[in-house]
Amino acid sequence: MKVLLRLICFIALLISSLEADKCKEREEKIILVSSANEIDVRPCPLNPNEHKGTITWYKDDSKTPVSTEQASRIHQHKEKLWFVPAKVEDSGHYYCVVRNSSYCLRIKISAKFVENEPNLCYNAQAIFKQKLPVAGDGGLVCPYMEFFKNENNELPKLQWYKDCKPLLLDNIHFSGVKDRLIVMNVAEKHRGNYTCHASYTYLGKQYPITRVIEFITLEENKPTRPVIVSPANETMEVDLGSQIQLICNVTGQLSDIAYWKWNGSVIDEDDPVLGEDYYSVENPANKRRSTLITVLNISEIESRFYKHPFTCFAKNTHGIDAAYIQLIYPVTNFQKHMIGICVTLTVIIVCSVFIYKIFKIDIVLWYRDSCYDFLPIKASDGKTYDAYILYPKTVGEGSTSDCDIFVFKVLPEVLEKQCGYKLFIYGRDDYVGEDIVEVINENVKKSRRLIIILVRETSGFSWLGGSSEEQIAMYNALVQDGIKVVLLELEKIQDYEKMPESIKFIKQKHGAIRWSGDFTQGPQSAKTRFWKNVRYHMPVQRRSPSSKHQLLSPATKEKLQREAHVPLG
C-alpha cells in the first residue's frame, strides 16, 4: 500500500513538472529590497488581466516547491511567500507558478535582503521614495504593511523616525493614522529619510518590520511668468560710433518669448544697425527654470540711441516682465587722472628723496651760495668765531708735523680765505701772557662750531683726555652752550677705544669727516668732497663779494712750513 502511494505521488510530481515546463514565462522588473533579520512577505505579482489559479512557489530553478510548513523559516502560507525571518543569504530568484485546468504562468521575481549600514537604522538600498507638494498637507505611506494585519484585520502600531531619531507625533506638525504619517503644511524643512517601525507576532514570536522612506518635496505647480535676471533698469556708458552687445538674460520656460524694443518698436529684421540673436539653455532638473538669452547686436552707436532706452520684454501666457538699459555718453574718469597724478607725485617724491640723499651736501651748499643773500638778515647771535679748532699739540720746540701744517696753514687757507669763515686757533689767535683757561673758555663760547682734529698716532690721543683745553672746550660744547662738534680725521683711525668717552659719543652720533690722500701735495680747493663736507657742517656764512677762492700752491706750502710757528702745548 505504501509503495502504491509513493508511486502515485511520484506520478503527480512528474505530471506537474511536465505541466510547468509548458508554462508561460514572465519576469517581474521591480526588485524589492528589504531589511535582513526581519519578517518579510512576498506576494505573487499577478496583473489584473492574468488568470487566477493555484499558486506554488519555487526557489531558483528547483523543481521542488517551497515548503508549506509554517515552522519552516522560508515557507508558503496561503498564496504568499514568507521569510521568518529573512537572511542576507536568502537573496536570489524565486518563482511563483499559477495553474488552473487550462492555464499555467511562471513569474520570476528577484528578492534582496540587506543589513543596516554602520551608524544608521537602515540601508540605502532599501529606501522607498515618496513625494509630496509643498504648502499643503500630505501623507507618507509605510509600504507593504497590509500583509501583517491581525485576526481583527487591524494593522500593527507604527513608530516613526526621521533620520533615525524618534519623531514627535504632536498632531500639529505630524500625526499617525494607521499606516500613514500625516505631514501638516509640507515645507522644504520636512525633507529627509523617515523610518516606520513595527512588531508582528507570528506563531507566538515577535519579529521586527522596518521600512525607510525618502521624503522629497515638490514645488507648487503654480503658473509662473518669466523673470528677467539682467538687465536691471540700468545705464551704460558707451562711446559714439562704438560697437556693443546688449544681453537680456531670462529665467522661464523654453516656450517663453524674449525680445528687445527701442522707442516703442520691436527690432526690424532688416535693420542695418540693430540685430537680435536668441539662445536657450534647458534645465533638466526643472524645465520651468530654463534660461533664455536674447542678444541685441548694435554695429554702430548713433546719437539717436542716447534719446530712448533699449527695453527687453519676456512674456508667456501667465504674464510679462520688462527691463531697460539707457545708453549715456561716457563721463570723464577723474579717478584715473587722480591715480596717475598720485603715481607721478609718488615717483617724483621718491626720486627727489633719493637724489637729495646722494647730493644733499651739494644741494645745501648751492642753496647757501645762491639764495642766502636774498634771505632776511637774522639778528646777531653774539658769536665772534665760526669755529674753534681743537688739535693735538706738537711736543718739542721747532718741530712741525703734518697736523700743524693742516691746522695753521691749510685750514685758514681754505675756510678763511676761500670760504670767508673766521677761525680761532689756539697758538695763533691768543696773546702772550694771557691766562690759558680764561682764553679757552672765553673763545669757545664765542665760537659757533668746535672742530676737533684727530690723528692716528696713539700718542696723539693722550692730549684729548688730560689737557685743560680739551676739557674746557668739550664742557662748553656738550654741556653748557650746546655747540655743534665736527670731527676731522687726518688719517684712518681703526680703533676709538682709547679715545675719551665724549669723542666716542660724538663719533657714534654724528660720525667723522676723513681726509683721503696727502694734503701737502697739490693745491687745495673748497670745491673738493672733503671740504664740501666740512662746509656743510659749518654755519651759514654771508661771504663778502670781494672774496675769491684761492688755491694752496706747492711753493706756498713750502713757505708756510718755513714760517710755521707752533707754540708748545
Swiss-Prot record:
Compartments where found: Membrane; Cell membrane; Secreted
A biological process term (GO) from this entry: positive regulation of phosphatidylinositol 3-kinase/protein kinase B signal transduction
One Pfam short name: TIR
Residues bearing attached sugar chains per UniProt: N100, N193, N233, N249, N263, N297
GO-annotated cellular components: cell surface; external side of plasma membrane; extracellular region; membrane; plasma membrane
PROSITE patterns noted in UniProt: IG_LIKE, TIR
Organism in which the protein naturally occurs: Homo sapiens
Annotated phenotype, changing K131D: Severely decreased interaction with IL1RN
Domain Ig-like C2-type: 23-110, 118-210, 226-328
Chain's gene name: IL1R1
Cysteine pairs bridged by disulfides in the record: C23-C104, C44-C96, C121-C164, C142-C196, C248-C312
Tissue expression profile of the protein: Expressed in T-helper cell subsets. Preferentially expressed in T-helper 1 (Th1) cells.
Name of the protein in its database record: Interleukin-1 receptor type 1
Record keyword Ribonucleoprotein present: no
Membrane topology: Single-pass type I membrane protein
Bias-annotated ranges (Basic and acidic residues): 556-569
